[in-house]
Design a protein with these regions (language model features):
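Non-catalytic, usually N-terminal nucleic-acid engagement modules in DNA/RNA processing proteins
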Residues: 1-98
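Glycine-rich phosphate/ribose-binding loops and adjacent secondary-structure elements
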Residues: 75-78, 84-95, 99-131
Length: 131
């Protein structure tokens, strides 16, 4: 079973969200209440679902998006990936974790920009230490 991080779902709430370094604040489309989702929250939800593969929390940008915005998004997504790795390692060390062998996959972002697509691929492969 593969679970998604919620990044695309947050993207789909563009008019209701506010992206920050710590994560994303958004208003429920159902009742308007404020909700926060960050890398750690995403990992905890996916761990509780006991999927085989969990996806790292990422920022999905519109197509097309300006280069600078996309670059900042790629850098934030890489930082979020590192936080996902840290949280997954912590969760997998707990006695009550259901699936201690859950795998974490990074998501390749970068919009339409080849250099950014290559950069995040390199970050995912070499800098994140995926479990």
């Amino acid at each position: 079973i593969l679970t998604d991080s919620g990044g695309f779902q947050v993207f789909s709430l563009a008019k209701l969200r506010n992206i920050k370094e710590e994560g994303v604040y958004f208003n429920s489309h159902i009742d308007g209440r404020k909700i926060f989702m960050g890398p750690e929250e995403s990992m905890r939800i996916q761990s509780n679902l006991a999927s085989t593969i969990a996806m790292a929390f990422d920022e999905c940008v519109e197509n097309p998006s300006p280069y600078e915005y996309t670059k900042n998004s790629v850098e934030r997504t890489t930082r979020w990936l590192k936080r996902c790795v840290t949280e997954m390692k912590r969760l997998n060390s707990l006695d009550d974790t259901i699936n201690k062998n859950q795998m974490l996959f990074g998501i390749n972002q970068g919009g339409i920009y080849d250099d950014l697509l290559r950069k995040i691929k390199s970050d995912i492969l070499w800098e994140s230490e995926l479990p």
